[in-house]
Amino acid sequence: MRLAKNENKILFIAEVSSNHHRDLNRSFAFIDAAAQAGCHSVKFQLFKIEQLFSPEILERSEKHRKREEWELPNEFLPELAARCRKNNVEFSCTPFYLDAVEELEPYVD
């Protein structure tokens, strides 16, 4: 499914964000629930803490360093995209650093 084909319709996007807890099965559960609820797309976020914050901030702030736990592992991408296809929903993901665009390209429409 390509969302662009639905130009005149309301689209429902389930925002998982970083609530996956780096757990693939939890991510699958979000996708399955979103599909069952009738969502058109499931959206994640792809970021790397060292790309978001300066080394000085990360060195001084444990709170910021702990956000590394929120990162979506790149190895999840093909499996998340496949699970979305299986559920007939679109996989989408916000890239937060330039290289993320290339990393996501094979998996998004």
Identify the function of each model-found stretch.
Residues 40-72:
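Glycine-rich, proline-tolerant flexible connector loops at the mouths of alpha/beta enzymes
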Residues 15, 34, 104:
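Conserved, mostly hydrophobic/aromatic
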Residues 1, 27-43:
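Short amphipathic alpha-helices and their capping/turn segments at secondary-structure boundaries
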Residues 60-109:
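Active-site beta->alpha loop and helix N-cap motifs at the rims of alpha/beta catalytic domains
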Residues 17-19, 45-49, 96-98:
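Active-site beta-loop-alpha junctions enriched in small/polar residues
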Residues 12-14, 42-44, 91-93, 109:
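Hydrophobic faces of well-ordered beta-strands that scaffold small-molecule active sites
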Residues 1-14:
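N-terminal amphipathic alpha-helix/helix-capping segment at the start of soluble metabolic enzymes
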